[in-house]
Amino acid sequence: MKTKRLYCFLFTLGLIFNVACNQLSKEEQEFDALMQKVIDVHDEVMPKMGTMSSLIKDLEPKIDTTATGKSYATAQKDLKDSYDFMMDWMGDFSNKFPHGEENTTKDIEKFTAKMKMLQEEELEVKKLRDQINSSINNAKKLLEKS
């Protein structure tokens, strides 16, 4: 009977220890939540890449030397800049945060640096989202007028 209790106790203790060791720290949970926010903004604007490409093509025949034609050229340039911004951001993000890389608090200096980079990426991706949305809205308004 005592042996059975001992095994039960050791099993329970081992289970508790295993669960406790596999939990993410508060900092790691914050990192994961922030990473998800950044990815969510990316996922929001990624489908708009096709729209930007179409609008760039739609604006092309309307560009000329008149004032109206120049406004189409400006709108097209804004779309191209937004498109390039997205491509550059994705490449940069992939270099900073390679797929499959673990970001744990085991090396606190490295983790802190990664968290700071991720906070900067959150600001950058929001700027990207705003630029993409603005360039699309502007181009659509111009094309509706014509």
Show where each model-derived region lies.
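Short charge-dense sequence patches
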Residues: K2, F31-V41, Q76-M90
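Charge-dense, low-complexity intrinsically disordered segments
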Residues: S25-E28, D32, A73, Q119, ...
